[in-house]
Amino acid sequence: MPESSEPAPEIYRLPWPEQFRALADLAQDSRLKSFYQTGCIPADTPMAEAPLVAMDFETTGLDADEHAIVSIGLVPFTMDGIPLGQARHWIVRPRLPLHKTSITIHGITHSDIEKAPDIEEILEDLLDSLAGRIPVVHYRDIERRFLDVALRNRIGQGIRFPLLDTMAIEAHLNPDRRPSRWQRLMGKKPVSIRLADSRLRYHLPHYAGHNALIDAIATAELLQAQIRHHF
């Protein structure tokens, strides 16, 4: 494993476009350098004009230090549409063994990953798909953290990028989603901000979950609905 190098902490306090320029200078891997050199779209870009990419990972668990990515789904989109022909889906071989519980959840088996590439083998395509776009996820602690750890373990440097989190948006829109004990006794029910439940509030169709590409498409549709209804 390459020796990890960590940028100076003050870089992380810079605005994102300046962070990207600084991180491009520090990047030792050509694929990561190219990602940063593409740049970050300005913060004042109207949502109607923003290039976006929905991203979802299926993993062997929830702890990025103990578990690994097994599949990645990406789909570029804008507020005007989702070009499904440009979607990408990879099954990748984790360095850690699959657990029976994770196989039950995402359905990816040992035979599926036996000849699958390591994530480093698809890294150039993955970063090219993300470059110049704002990633959109449903629960940022999975995608950003797992990708950062995966890169640290392979090329010695992690990755940073701004993103939009549809789960965080739902949390903001439903501040009273966890009723008190008294409210529960009075019949008030909690509000789920899970992906499928959030989609139901916007009358979006039900999709089978735990497929990275399907969940990425579902996340793109959810953000479109959130923006149209609330912003």
What are these regions (language model features)?
Residues 215:
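Short, conserved phosphate/pyrophosphate- and ester-handling motifs at nucleotide-, phospho-/glycolipid
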Residues 122, 218-219:
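Short Asp/Glu-rich motifs
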Residues 164-187:
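Short alpha-helix plus adjacent loop in nuclease-associated cores
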Residues 57-60, 166, 219:
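Ser/Thr-centric signal marking residues that sit
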Residues 19-154, 158-160, 186-206, 210:
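Conserved non-catalytic scaffold segment of RNase H-like nuclease domains
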Residues 1-43, 172, 200-201, 220-231:
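Acidic two-metal-ion nuclease catalytic site recognized across multiple nuclease folds
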